[in-house]
C-alpha cells in the first residue's frame, strides 16, 4: 500500500475521523485508524464499536492499493505537525508504515486490517433525505435535553420519529423535554429509533454544509448517514422511549407572552442568587406582571419584575432556573409563550412565531 497526498487535503478529514475515538481505547485496535487505498481513493475509518466514521479522499498523486491500520493519535499528530504546504507520502513496508515528507521520516507500528472491527453488514429498512440545515436544526433544538449516564439507558440519546411526511427529534431527561420537527419530501410509514448520545453529538459535527443533502438509512439496529465525503454509522439503543405525546400539556388555562431575550436576562440575573444545588426560582404571575425571586442558604435574595402579557388566574410556580435558561438559550426568538395550568403541572414553552419546536419543563416545589 502506498499513497501521496497534500497535507491540506488530508488534515481536515483525518481530524474529523480521529475525533470519534474520544478517550482511551478498550482494545488496541480501536485506537487505530483503518487506511484503505483502492482505485484512486483513500478511505480512513475509525470506530469505538458504538459509532463508526469513514472519510473518503480522492488521491491525485501516485498510489498502490492495499489496507492497514495505524495508531490514530500518532498519525494525526505527525500530519498536524508538518508544514501547511507539505506533501505526505505513506508507504507500507513489512509491518511498518513509513510516513515521509520533505526531510522528515516516521516509522509507525501497525496492526492488520483484518483485525479491524466492522459494524456488521446490515439492511436499510427506510431511507430519508433532507438538507443538512434541517437535520442540524432538529438536533440543536433538542440535544440539551438528552440524559447523560441515566440508569434509564433509553434516555441517554435522542428519539427520531418518522411519521408520514414529518421527521421529529425528541429528547428528555425526565425533568424537561424538547420536541422538534421538520418536513420530509415524501410520505413514510411510522418508525421510531433511539440514537445514542455519542452518535448524536458526532453526527451534528459533520453537518457543516447547510444547503447540501444528508441521506439517512435506518436499519433494525443501526443508523447510517451519508454526509459530504463521510459515511457515519451508529448503533441504535435497544429500548422503548417514553410516549412523549402524553407529556405535552394538553389543557392549559394560563398563558404568558413576553420578549424571549428580556425573559432570559431576568432569569439569568435571578439565577446568580439561587441555591447552587437545587437552582430553584419562584415565579409569580398576575395582572400582566411577572415576579421572579430567588434566594440561597446565605439568605441572599434576588427579585426581578417584568411587564408581560398574561391571561388566566394568578399563579405561583417554582422552576429549576437552569432548565428554563437552556430552553430560552436554544429558542433565541423574538417572543416566547409559556402555557401552564397549575403549580404542580408542567409548563409548555414555545416560540410565538414558529411551531416547529416545543419545550416542556417540570415545576419544582420550593
Curated annotation (Swiss-Prot):
GO cellular component: cytoplasm; DNA polymerase III complex
InterPro entries named among the record's database cross-references: DNA_clamp_sf, DNA_polIII_beta, DNA_polIII_beta_C, DNA_polIII_beta_cen, DNA_polIII_beta_N
Pfam families listed in its UniProt record: DNA_pol3_beta, DNA_pol3_beta_2, DNA_pol3_beta_3
GO molecular function: 3'-5' exonuclease activity; DNA binding; DNA-directed DNA polymerase activity
Cross-referenced SMART domains: POL3Bc (SM00480)
Keywords of the record: Cytoplasm, DNA replication, DNA-binding, DNA-directed DNA polymerase, Nucleotidyltransferase, Transferase
Keyword ATP-binding among record annotations: no
GO biological process, one term: DNA strand elongation involved in DNA replication
UniProt subcellular location: Cytoplasm
Subunit structure and binding partners: Forms a ring-shaped head-to-tail homodimer around DNA which binds and tethers DNA polymerases and other proteins to the DNA. The DNA replisome complex has a single clamp-loading complex (3 tau and 1 each of delta, delta', psi and chi subunits) which binds 3 Pol III cores (1 core on the leading strand and 2 on the lagging strand) each with a beta sliding clamp dimer. Additional proteins in the replisome are other copies of gamma, psi and chi, Ssb, DNA helicase and RNA primase.
Family to which this protein belongs: Belongs to the beta sliding clamp family.
Function description: Confers DNA tethering and processivity to DNA polymerases and other proteins. Acts as a clamp, forming a ring around DNA (a reaction catalyzed by the clamp-loading complex) which diffuses in an ATP-independent manner freely and bidirectionally along dsDNA. Initially characterized for its ability to contact the catalytic subunit of DNA polymerase III (Pol III), a complex, multichain enzyme responsible for most of the replicative synthesis in bacteria; Pol III exhibits 3'-5' exonuclease proofreading activity.
PANTHER family reported in the protein's UniProt record: BETA SLIDING CLAMP, DNA POLYMERASE III SUBUNIT BETA
Protein name, entry field: Beta sliding clamp
Biological source species: Vibrio cholerae serotype O1 (strain ATCC 39315 / El Tor Inaba N16961)
Amino acid at each position: 500500500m502506498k499513497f501521496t497526498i497534500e497535507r491540506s487535503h488530508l488534515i481536515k478529514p483525518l481530524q474529523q475521523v480521529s475525533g470519534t475515538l474520544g478517550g482511551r481505547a478498550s482494545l488496541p485496535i480501536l485506537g487505530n485508524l483503518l487506511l484503505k487505498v483502492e482505485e484512486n481513493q483513500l478511505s480512513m475509518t475509525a470506530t469505538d464499536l458504538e459509532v463508526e466514521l469513514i472519510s473518503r479522499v480522492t488521491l491525485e498523486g501516485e498510489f498502490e492499493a492495499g489496507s492497514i491500520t495505524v495508531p490514530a493519535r500518532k498519525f494525526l499528530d505527525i500530519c498536524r505537525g508538518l508544514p501547511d504546504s507539505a506533501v505526505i507520502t505513506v508507504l507500507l513496508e513489512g509491518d511498518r508504515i513509513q510516513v515521509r515528507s520533505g526531510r522528515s521520516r516516521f516509522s509507525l507500528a501497525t496492526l492488520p486490517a483484518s483485525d479491524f472491527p466492522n459494524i456488521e453488514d446490515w439492511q436499510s429498512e427506510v431511507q430519508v433525505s433532507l438538507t443538512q440545515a434541517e437535520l442540524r436544526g432538529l438536533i440543536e433544538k433538542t440535544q440539551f435535553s438528552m440524559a447523560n449516564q441515566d440508569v434509564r439507558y433509553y434516555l441517554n440519546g435522542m428519539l427520531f420519529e418518522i411519521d408520514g411526511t414529518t421527521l421529529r427529534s425528541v429528547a428528555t431527561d425526565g425533568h424537561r423535554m424538547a420536541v422538534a420537527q421538520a418536513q420530509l419530501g415524501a410520505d413514510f410509514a411510522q418508525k421510531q429509533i433511539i440514537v445514542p448520545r455519542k452518535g448524536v453529538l458526532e453526527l451534528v459535527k459533520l453537518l457543516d454544509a447547510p444547503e447540501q443533502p444528508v441521506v439517512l438509512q435506518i436499519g433494525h439496529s443501526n443508523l447510517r448517514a451519508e454526509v459530504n465525503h463521510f459515511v457515519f454509522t451508529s448503533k441504535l439503543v435497544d429500548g422503548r422511549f417514553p410516549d412523549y405525546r402524553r407529556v405535552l400539556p394538553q389543557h392549559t388555562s394560563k398563558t404568558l407572552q413576553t420578549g424571549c431575550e428580556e425573559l432570559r436576562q431576568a432569569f439569568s440575573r435571578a439565577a446568580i442568587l439561587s441555591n447552587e444545588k437545587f437552582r430553584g426560582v419562584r415565579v409569580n404571575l398576575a395582572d400582566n406582571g411577572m415576579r421572579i425571586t430567588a434566594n440561597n442558604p446565605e439568605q441572599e435574595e434576588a427579585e426581578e419584575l417584568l411587564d408581560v402579557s398574561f391571561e388566566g388566574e394568578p399563579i405561583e410556580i417554582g422552576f429549576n432556573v437552569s432548565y428554563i435558561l437552556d430552553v430560552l438559550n436554544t429558542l433565541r426568538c423574538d417572543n416566547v409563550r409559556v402555557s401552564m395550568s397549575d403549580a404542580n403541572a408542567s409548563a409548555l414553552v414555545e416560540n410565538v412565531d414558529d411551531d416547529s419546536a416545543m419545550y416542556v419543563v417540570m415545576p419544582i416545589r420550593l
